[in-house]
Amino acid sequence: MSVSLAPKLNHRGEHILSPESFNSGLMAFLDASPSPFHAVAAMRQALQLQGFDDLDPTATWSIGGGTNALITRNHSSLIAFRVGTAPLADTGIRIIGAHTDSPCLRIKPSPDVRRSGVHQLGVEVYGGVLLAPWFDRDLSIAGRVTCTDAQGRRLSLLIDFERPIVTIPSLAIHLNRDVHKNRTLNSQQEVVPILGDLANETETGFHRMLLDQVHHQHPESDVQAVIDYELSCYDTQCAQRVGIHGDYLASARLDNLLSCYAGLRSLLDAETEQSVLLVCNDHEEVGSASAAGAQGPFLHTVLERLCGDTETLARALARSLLISADNAHALHPNYDNKHDPQHQPRLNGGPVIKFNANQRYATNSETAATFRELCTRAGVPVQSIAMRSDMACGSTIGPITSTVLGVNTVDVGAPQLGMHSIRETTGWKDPVLLYQALLQLFESEKL
């Protein structure tokens, strides 16, 4: 899909973008990105349309001032950058980081379960999923399949069934009168999607169904067999504007495709002579320890090749700043005691700076002050969050990337409700406010 790029300049040549204009592109991106593979494909296409070159990791790179380029890893992580005219050692690099993955249900390698007259699919929980909201939804399946063609060549393709093909029905309350009393879910036994009635089954199993879908979506590929796959269930309900006055945006995968899109738009829209870079890692929701994750060498390798030698890299990183953008917990009106009384971010209140004394976030006083100044320049309100002292908090790619690179980092994010649910909610104004702050990072002459 093509990421929508709306006009952003007023008559004075200043950046101006309404929430409606920005969110139309964001919602299209969310709907077109049911898996990290689809998200990276959409971002890659948007960058290519704006003249970014695809880099081959096995080739020698020729990079100089004015280079606009991108590179992917595993087709689920992406780095894109624009190189300024000044030496990197003298200017550093302005970096925005986000992640492409979201908690979900992944299809197991041998998924076919036949019992009680129905065909079901075995799934594995990916990340910290809120399981209850996955029940009674119209679910589809999307992701990457690896196949062989008629010549025996191996190729990987993206598929998306788009229509609802599986569901996980709840057990009726008449059969579970204690359902509202300390409910627990057994993901092996109770979270098993139903694919269809065995009486109507004509395929030999899930792999045959995949092969038919590949033929439908990629008839030109002459695929003969599906060998393996990385597929996820997802909710077919599209992103929507909600609330009596349209105050909110509800969608799957706001954590963290909202930040990916805001970073992408900032990279594409920035009018700057600075060297700027966007990194969108996979596997954040499961710890980032992978070749495509923030603990892997992907970003360090790209920066090293950009700089040319370790001396230039060290000097460039010493002048660089990373904004790690990952959504933050907004105050929930039904559970307001879950927030520290002095740290209660609100929807439509602007980006949130994340603080944690135990380094679960990489923010320090200097990087927080820099981000506040960027927001002031952009005319964007800014909020802060620190968890209750008796509650643990999550983490982001911020501390990991900061540890790997030694780069100054601030953790921020748009406020949202329902984090890690199948459907999440943010303020209607919050995506564009985050974008405006990130754009200021790329466009400011000095930090």
Feature names for model-found ranges:
Residues 1-447:
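N-terminal hydrophobic/helix-forming segments and targeting peptides
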